[in-house]
Every structure is written in C-alpha cells, then in structure tokens.
Design a protein with these regions (language model features):
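Helix-loop boundary and gating motifs at the non-cytosolic
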Residues: 13-69, 239-244, 253-263, 269
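Hydrophobic core of transmembrane alpha-helices in multi-pass small-molecule transporters
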Residues: 31, 111-126, 325-339
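C-terminal ends and interior cores of transmembrane alpha-helices
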Residues: 93-108, 310-321
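C-terminal transmembrane helical hairpin of 12-TM major facilitator-type secondary transporters
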Residues: 295, 301-344
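A late C-terminal transmembrane helix in Major Facilitator Superfamily
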Residues: 351-380
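Intracellular juxtamembrane helix-capping segments at the cytosolic ends
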Residues: 44, 126-139, 338-352
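Helix-to-loop junctions at the C-terminal end of transmembrane segments
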Residues: 71-84, 286-300, 377
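C-terminal membrane-cytosol helix-exit motif in multi-pass small-molecule transporters
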Residues: 166-167, 171, 189-214, 399-403
Length: 405
C-alpha cells in the first residue's frame, strides 16, 4: 500500500505590517503631494488677485478640477497598460512642471502662463490621486480599508507638516522677492519632484502575491486578464459606486467652498473661518485609521450608509446661523466624504478599468458643484443649495443597496 504525499499547506497571507514596509514610498509620495497642493493650489485665488484679475479668482480652481476630470481616465488607461509606478511617476513629473509654470507666471505677471501651470497641476491630480487604488491592490482584501486609511492619514500629515513650514516659506519669499502665495508654487514643484523620486524607489507587489498566492513579478499590480470597462460597469454595484463617489465629491467640494463665504457674511473673523476649514480637513483625513478598519470589519454597506447619513447631517446643519453649527457641518461633511471615498475605493480596487472614469466623473462633479452651487446660492439662497446637496447625498444609499460585501 502506498501513502500519498501530504500536500504542503498554502502560504499564509502576509500581514499588513509586513506589506507596509514595501508601501512606504507610496505613502510618503502621497504626503508630499498633499503638502504640495497645500502650499500652491489652495492659494491660487490670491495669486489671481495679485495679477489684477480678482474677478476671475475662482478660475484656477475650476481649471484644476476640469483638468483633473479630463486626465483621470487617461492616467487610468496608462496605469492599466504600463503599471502603477509609471502612471504615478508621470503624474508627479507633470505636477512638478505645472508648479514651475505657475510660479513663473505668477512671478513675471503672466496670467495665461499661471493658468497653464494650474491646469497642469490639476491634470497631475487626476493621476496621483489614484494612488489609493495602488495601495488597496497591494494588500489582502480583508485589510484594504486599513491600507486606504493609512494613505489618508499620510495625506493630512503632509498638509499639516507643510503648514508648519510657513516661516521657512516666508524666508524663501523674502530672498526671491515674491509673496508666500507665489513661492508656494515653487515649493510645491519641488515636493512633487521628490514624490516622483519616491515612486521610482517603489516596487509594486502583484495583487496575487499580496494575497499570499504565487504570482509573477510585474509592475501592474494585477495578474491575469483584466475586465474591460464595459464588463466592469456591468458588474453589480459598480455603477452605483461610481455615482456615490461622484455625489460625495460634489457635495463635499461645494459645501466646503461656499460656507466659508457665508461665514464671512455672518461676521466671523478669519481665525474662526480657518477653524472651520481645519475641522473639515480633520474629518476628511484624520480618522482614516479608524474608518478604514471599521469598513473592513463591518462591511461596505456600513461605509455607504454611515457616509450618506453624515452628508445629510452636513447639509442640514450647514444652514445654521451659528459658528458651532457650521463647525459641526464642516466636520461631518469631511467624515462622511471619508467613509464614502474609502468604501468606493475598496470596491473599485477590484475593477481597474473603472477607476479612471470614476475619478473623472468625481472631479467633474466637483467642478460643476462649485460652479452651479455658487449660481444657485446667489439666485435662491443657501437653503436651496443645502437642499440640493441633501438630495445628492441619497446616492450612497443606492450604492449600499447594490454593493456586495
């Protein structure tokens, strides 16, 4: 009688801690990118005022959103064909060039050149913000929420660290003979160039290897045939996920941009308005280490339902006439966006062909939200804007009904 050899047990999936040692260049590059946008694009309206075009102060933000919407699908295709490292590296290089153009245009008083730089930096955002999919693909499915949460935490750390470098930027501005809002574009260009170096050091781990199964070494972070865009959209829950992501982005950007103006009209000082923005950023990014594991543990429906409820609360409390009410609105607005963004990213990590188009639609929603939201507020008042935002906040509940997992 012969005894069949015992098959060796399959290797255990690697832990997140072991995988994080390979993800640090990706995380650090995202922190650098967030720091770059903190010192550049956020102050674009001030640069336009310096250039004598205060009536067009919102144009750079619109160009940034539109450029990101137009580029996201193209970067998604590039990453599918050539891999995450090449796609993200190209985005960081493009962003660095955009920062240099923006600095040159602002310093020499060339408004078209400055706007070209803003558009270039916006197009880069359409690419490098897809780093979240790379992070999710690099770890096993049960800890993808955690991987995404860490990425969000690194984003807010990058923003906060750069805020602390204000005195150094002021000193550099003095040596260059420019304002801080102009020098920020040069600093941002340098940070994005450094992010490109970080991505060059990154060695993506194939998805199958991240899950603990054998795979060939490639830069695609995927193995086997990938579903096409049509096949991805036909899968249950994908279209509703894209709709939820776009709605959350539109609601977040619109209610983030317009309440500070309303707070100013209420008589709040700049310090109080800055506190509103800080509370919003904390809600967006600071709780990633909590919300990511919660989504892993409680499921995708939890993320969509809780995110939708928080967006509804944000819309409802945004009409308040008190600072406390506005602070609550801005905070839960950020936290609701956090939950929906993490959940949507976890879903779309299984459908690479849909990632670029999803981000394009989200950026387009943000651009339309700020443009049409301002017109609606001027014509019908802020309550009408809040009501519209509340209606859009219902889309995540559709995604919760359709999603699997």
């Amino acid at each position: 009688m012969t005894v069949s050899p015992v098959s060796p047990a399959p290797p255990a999936p690697p832990t997140f801690a072991s995988l994080a040692t390979r993800l640090w260049p990706l995380y650090l590059s995202q922190a650098l990118a967030t720091g770059a946008t903190t010192v550049s694009t956020i102050l674009a309206s001030l640069v336009m005022a310096d250039l004598g075009s205060e009536q067009l102060s919102g144009l750079p933000s619109t160009l940034i959103s539109l450029a990101a919407a137009l580029s996201a699908s193209s970067f998604g295709v590039l990453m599918l064909r050539r891999g995450r490292r090449i796609g993200l590296g190209s985005a960081f290089v493009l962003g660095s060039l955009g920062g240099l153009l923006g600095f040159a245009g602002a310093r020499w008083g060339l408004t078209p050149l400055f706007l070209a730089g803003a558009a270039g930096l916006g197009a880069a955002q359409g690419g490098f913000q897809q780093a979240r999919y790379a992070a999710a693909e690099s770890v096993p499915a049960p800890v993808r929420g955690l991987a995404l949460g860490v990425l969000m935490l690194m984003s807010v750390l990058g923003s906060w660290v750069m805020t602390g470098f204000g005195p150094q930027i002021t000193a550099l501005s003095g040596r260059l003979g420019t304002g801080e809002e102009v020098t920020g574009w040069l600093v941002g260009a340098g940070l994005l160039a450094l992010a490109a170096v970080m991505i060059a050091l990154w060695r993506p781990l194939p998805a199958a290897s991240a899950a603990g199964t054998p795979a060939s070494n490639s830069d695609t972070s995927q193995t086997g045939a990938k579903p096409s865009l049509a096949e991805s959209l036909a899968a249950p829950g994908v279209k509703s996920t894209i709709a939820a992501l776009a709605a959350a982005q539109a609601v977040m950007v619109t209610l983030m941009s317009l309440p500070p103006l309303r707070a100013h009209h209420m008589g709040l000082e700049h310090g109080s308005i800055a506190g509103l923005v800080s509370g919003h950023i904390a809600g967006m990014f600071a709780f990633g280490l909590l919300t990511g594991p919660l989504i892993d543990r409680l499921g995708l429906r939890f993320g969509y339902v809780m995110g939708g409820l928080l967006l509804l609360l944000a819309a409802g409390t945004s009409v308040t006439g008190t600072r406390a009410g506005l602070l609550l609105s801005m905070f839960v607005l950020g936290l609701g966006w956090n939950l929906i963004s993490l959940t949507s990213s976890k879903v779309l990590s299984r459908w690479p062909a849909a990632q670029g188009p999803a981000d394009s639609l989200a950026f387009a929603g943000a651009a339309l939200g700020t443009l049409l939201g301002g017109l609606l507020m001027a014509r019908s008042g802020f309550p009408a804007l809040a009501l519209t935002a509340g209606m859009l906040a219902l889309l995540p509940f559709w995604a919760a009904w359709r999603v699997r997992g």
